Amino acid sequence: MRVLSVDHVSYTYPQQNMPAVNDVDFSLERGSYTAVVGLNGSGKSTLARILCGLLDADCGEVSYASGVRSALVFQSPKDQIICSVVFRDTAFGPQNLALPPDEVELRTIESLAVVGLLHKASSPSVTLSLGQTQKEALAGIIAIDPDVIILDEALSMLDPDSKNDIFAFLSYWIRKGRTVVHITHDIDAIRKAQDVIAMEKGKIVYSGTTDDFFTDTELCERITGEKIVKSVFKKNNKNAMKFSAVSNMPDAEAARRTIVC
């Protein structure tokens, strides 16, 4: 089932001559994981903002299937932190969906457990490290359970173990039928994806499977700016970690509290 269609979308920033996004056209299916890749200035972050409605395209159309909800996780996590305490901030989204208090609490605990911040639930947000703040922002998005999640370099500040935990969750999430769009230039992140959309100067120059993208070494190196060793590449999800049920977390009960924001 198609969840997102991008129909010949273009966007030029005010007082700029060249479009940041130029005649971009693609569609995404439910349960897919697509990496949107390119060097700085290629237009991928601008595209992310158009997909989430933060920017209006000059021409073309972005359309979601009926009832589909999308969410964006920014590269700078502080742009998304609203409340002063980690638990309250993560609960903010579910609360504004008018969910029952028990459901808000459950989603908040599960989301913090997924990103490895359950032990920081009662901590002030300002006391977190930059990497932990990025996890907090991601937890807040996970808690609203969007159908499409757009990650704009949102894992760039995480350590390798934390990244693996998030990738494991995303793999589980995709199996539930959710769709992931990952704006990135990180080779490891690209390898986790099923498909790749490569951008240069605002245009799509490649759209296809991850395997085929890495097979075209010249294109891959030009788009990522990295030297690619073919023998190192492994097909997607080979290293995916198994998702651990949140109910098994020993400190989950300790995080339960009255949610006020």
Residue ranges and their predicted role:
Residues 203-226:
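Conserved beta-strand-loop-alpha-helix hinge in the C-terminal portion
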Residues 37-39:
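The feature captures the beta-strand-to-loop junction immediately N-terminal to the Walker
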Residues 124-128, 132:
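Conserved ABC ATPase signature
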Residues 183-185:
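H-loop/switch region of ABC-family ATPase nucleotide-binding domains
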Residues 1-3, 10-23:
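A short, flexible loop at the N-terminus of ABC-type nucleotide-binding domains that lies
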Residues 102-120:
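Conserved ABC ATPase "signature" region
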Residues 52:
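Helix-to-loop junction immediately C-terminal to a conserved catalytic motif
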